[in-house]
């Protein structure tokens, strides 16, 4: 059966986004040019710009795809936490593992680049704002989340995400396994003590 134009478009965009993610993981954002990414995707540079008006739009779509995958993984894994297992340390472990993954490094690369690139910063702010709202909702659905006050819950979610993001960045340069193994028990104790 012949593919429709819409199917071909979706397949091309999916290949471009995967190539962008893989390229940034492998060589970093600074060397992830349109030519390098499109070569990896097996399409022309023109094809990229038929689907995305600017490189900033394409990088925002790349960030959105990374965040979509991470949210999907987080939500799926949280739903699989056994009822007899404490939800908080299990969810923190899932968050740690996601932020430590190579795909998350794409976000770090894009956020660092956005610090000095106003257009990229503007597009990422929108994508990250949407993601923050979705991660808040996913965290709110965790068993036991209702015990945290609504007014402080967004701060707690941001704090936990930032802790693991920061740890993932530092880990690449200065691994500290002795601290790593203590992080989740310490965070769990701090969070439950505040209830």
UniProtKB/Swiss-Prot annotation:
It comes from the Bacteria. One of its GO terms (molecular function) is transcription cis-regulatory region binding. GO terms for cellular component: cytosol. PROSITE patterns: HTH_TETR_1, HTH_TETR_2. InterPro entries: DNA-bd_HTH_TetR-type_CS, Homeodomain-like_sf, HTH-type_TetR-like_transc_reg, HTH_TetR. Keywords: DNA-binding, Transcription, Transcription regulation. Gene3D superfamilies: Tetracycline Repressor, domain 2. Residues 10-70 form the HTH tetR-type domain. GO terms for biological process: regulation of DNA-templated transcription. Residues 33-52 bind DNA. It holds the Pfam family TetR_N. This is Uncharacterized HTH-type transcriptional regulator Rv2912c.
